[in-house]
Amino acid sequence: MFDIGVGELTLIAVVALVVLGPERLPKAARFAGLWVRRARMQWDSVKQELERELEAEELKRSLQDVQASLREAEDQLRNKQQQVEQGARALHDDVSRDIDIRSSATPVATPLELAHADLSASAHVDAAAGAAAGAGPAPAPAAPVIAQAQPIAPAPHQTLVPAPHDTIVPAPHAAHLTSAPAPPVTVAPVDAGTSASPTPSEPTKIQEKQP
């Protein structure tokens, strides 16, 4: 504590032995030891108090730092809250302006006007009902006529009936005609200068044998 070395202690002991003598030296040593203990105890207590104070100061500094950070956070939160409130107020003002503009553009009907409108509507309805009752039942709307294509019936199958076979009755001279052969017909050459009229030929046997 006092930074006293071994040589210094021996020097102090020799001086005390010479001054006090051998009889008083033990008592003086005990007294000096007690004072040294007390001084050390005091020093230790002071040292501990100093350390405690230093720790308390450090804690205070740390608390101050924390408080400063908390204050900064509070300031930031307040600024944000103010910004949000300003935005909400601006939005509220815009909405109120729009509502005022719309309300001024479209006037609100009073209760008297609403009652008058209801009465007029009921009067119109009664008048229309009376007119409909006096005119009689309204004719039913004509149903739209839709021309439907009728299916074409197939034509009846026509059966061709063969005509009766005509029986040809031979004439009495038919046998003679078939049995007698016809003579050959001779054609004379016709000149260019002469007329093209045919010359009468001799009557055939068929013509002679006519009845």
Swiss-Prot record:
Pfam families: TatA_B_E (PF02416). It comes from Xanthomonas oryzae pv. oryzae (strain MAFF 311018). It is a single-pass membrane protein. InterPro entries: TatA/B/E, TatB. It comes from the Bacteria. The keyword Metal-binding does not apply. Part of the twin-arginine translocation (Tat) system that transports large folded proteins containing a characteristic twin-arginine motif in their signal peptide across membranes. Together with TatC, TatB is part of a receptor directly interacting with Tat signal peptides. TatB may form an oligomeric binding site that transiently accommodates folded Tat precursor proteins before their translocation. NCBIfam families: PRK04654.1, tatB. This is Sec-independent protein translocase protein TatB. Residues 175-211 are annotated as: Disordered. One of its GO terms (cellular component) is TAT protein transport complex. Gene3D superfamilies: 1.20.5.3310. Belongs to the TatB family. Keywords: Cell inner membrane, Cell membrane, Membrane, Protein transport, Translocation, Transmembrane, Transmembrane helix, Transport.
